[in-house]
Amino acid sequence: MFKQLSQIGKNLTDELAKGLADDMSPTPSEQQIEDDKSGLPKEIQAKLRKFEKYEQKYPLLLSAYKNEKLKSEKLEAVEKILAENTPISNIDDAVDTLPAFFQDLNNKNNLLNDEIKRLTKQNSEIPESASSETLKDKEEEFLKKEQNYKNDIDDLKKKMEALNIELDTVQKEKNDTVSGLREKIVALENILKEEREAKKQKEEVSISELKEELAIKNHSLEDSRMKITELEQNLSSKSTIMEEKSSELAELNITLKEKERKLSELEKKMKELPKAISHQNVGNNNRRKKNRNKGKKNKGGITTGDISEEETVDNSINTEEYDKLKENLQELQEKYKDCEDWKQKYEDIEAELKDAKELENSQLEKSAKELETLNTELIDTKKSLKEKNSELEEVRDMLRTVGNELVDAKDEIKESSSKQNEEVKTVKLELDDLRHKNATMIEAYEAKNTELRSKIELLSKKVEHLKNLCTEKEKEQTTSQNKVAKLNEEISQLTYEKSNITKELTSLRTSYKQKEKTVSYLEEQVKQFSEQKDVAEKSTEQLRKDHAKISNRLDLLKKENETLHNDIAKNSNSYEEYLKENGKLSERLNILQEKYNTLQNVKSNSNEHIDSIKRQCEELNVKLKESTKKILSLEDELNEYANIVQDKTREANTLRRLVSDSQTDDSSKQKELENKLAYLTDEKNKLEAELDLQTSRKATELQEWKHTVTELKSEIHALKLREEGLKSEVDALKHVNNDIKRKTQATSDDSDQLEQITSNLKLSLSKADEKNFELQSANEKLLNLNNELNKKFDRLLKNYRSLSSQLNALKERQYSDKSGRVSRSGSIGTLANANIDSSPANNSNPTKLEKIRSSSSLELDSEKNEKIAYIKNVLLGFLEHKEQRNQLLPVISMLLQLDSTDEKRLVMSLK
């Protein structure tokens, strides 16, 4: 109906467009009207022109509407005829259904004509005087057919029995497979839950352990750094001492060289002394001789005692000098020996310092390597987290697919038989529970994932903090090196002062004693440093052992994580396969039920159905074998989980052993290990409790499955009863077959066919009656709509007539106004020519004018009210009736003087 109205609207718009060209050319009557309207304002003239156009188009619209109404009535009559005589409910369906309906009628007519021809031929071929031989032949043929039918019936009975047995086996297998699959699904869900919980616990434990290990490593790093700083300070002090000693050694070497020179000079002098003494003796002798000779000459009285006294004086002087020289030599030799001892001590201290520097450098390199390993471990953990996130997304996708498959399974279960509705409801509830559990598990896993991410961020922040500490400590090292440089400068100044002091021999002795004391002090410090170095080496060895243990534990955890991921992937794949198999089995069940129902009607093609059922049974047997294999694989997986639990207990035992071995260490480490042991024992207890819960759940599930098995047995019993009913129907069919054999006349077959045709015709008639009833209801609705539209159209006509009457009244008033003006101009001329008689006429004219004005004002008010009412009705109709908005839009735009933009805005606001 709405399509017809839209077509009517299109036709009207086309006719209006055609009529516009005719309307554009003004007629002489319009010209006269325009001349008449010249006295009115421009707005009213424009509106009147529009109304005149609508006046000319109105009869066209009426005629078009009447034609379309006649067409719609004819179409309704055609629809009624088609609905009464054909299965067509709507004209829209006529294109598809009418040709098929006529083809079916033609086929039926052809079949009836063929049967009539066959019957007429049979009647013509059979002569009235049929011979006895032909009758005997027919009887023999009939008996043979009877025997063949009996044999076929026996074969069918045997096949039916075999089919019943096969159906029982198939149903049992199906029940077993369904129960096994449900058990597997529940077991897999429990395993997945346990694995997720175990993973979460393991991850939490590993994170806590990593935090503890990081804290321990941080403490160890800080201790090692403190030790390194102390060693560096000691090295700097030792280096200062070494420099002092080297400067002292240099000074001593200089003094030694000077003393050696002095010694060489003294040796030369010692060598030259005997020669000088001999020369002196010779000179003295010569002098003595000369003196003697002089004395003999001068005095002649000098004694021999004087000569001897002079000789003794000279010898005593030489011996004293020689003794002094010997003492100096001995002192120099002793000092030289002390310098050699100093050299040896200096070389020993240098070697020790070099060894200490090498050890400290190696320790620093090791600590740097440990930091690098920690950074790599952090990067690996981040990568593993990313992999876990990707695996999470994959698991979500898998769960979505599983949900979609479950929805498909729901739809298939809805289409199944009414007897399985209770089971379907239980399965739906289980599926909803599974979905809810999956959603909760995903949410929990996401929350844990966020917690792990936050923990990793905290760890990364801690690592950055450690790096900052390293940089700060490096800065402290640079400051300490600067301090060392300053100390070196001070030491150089001190050495310069010492060089000034060492020029004097007296100060050397005191400095020597002080140096001996400092050497003893340095030796004690070296011993202390060596002890500290041993302690630091032991601590580093312990740290290495702890790091090795932690790395081994991390490797084990990673391997366990990988194995668990692989198990999850396998379980998810097996879960999907089980769902697919479940869907396939449900489809097969539906197919078997449909085929079982079709067995009642199918008689001739029973062998083909038996073959197909056998194939399906074979396929089901194969699937049963596969399901048993999967059950075995799941049992193996359970054994593997038990082995994992045993491995964890072994790890706990090993940790206990480690705790017993490490009892000799500090009390803090012992407490930490005891806490770890307690945590692991709690984990073990939790795992044992979870295993007990799983066993209890499995026991309850077994009881539930037993209950379902009993229900399925009851269903099997019902199916057996149905089979017995079918057997009874088969017996009835046998009786019918015997009756048919007794009936030899062909007319009986024809009558049965005719009865079937009549039953089919009755069914078609009942369907046609139903369709006719539906069509009548639809027609009534359409009639109501049509009446409403007619009423609306009548209202529009009334409004249009009132407008046209108002226009005519306006035109008449305009004519009367013009005639009044002409008469007024004539009366004014007569008044100008007249003298006294015009005074009463002048007095009467204003009263008439006032009456005319009052009447015109009343008429204008009434016209305004009518226009307002008309506009109101049009607006209300436009807002109430969506169907007529396209038709009323130009009227509203004309009344309200709307532009194209205003029209668009109005339409958009209404939409």
Curated annotation (Swiss-Prot):
InterPro entries assigned to the protein according to its UniProt record, in alphabetical order: Golgi-autophagy_related (IPR051952), GRIP_dom (IPR000237)
Coiled coil, from the record: 101-280, 312-735, 766-814
Subcellular location: Cytoplasm; Golgi apparatus membrane
Pfam families per UniProt: GRIP
GRIP domain: residues covered: 861-909
Regions of compositional bias (Polar residues) in chain numbering: 822-847
Further details from the record: Present with 2350 molecules/cell in log phase SD medium.
Record note on quaternary structure: Forms oligomers and is present in high-molecular-mass complexes. Interacts with ARL1.
Protein name: Golgin IMH1
Gene from which the chain derives: IMH1
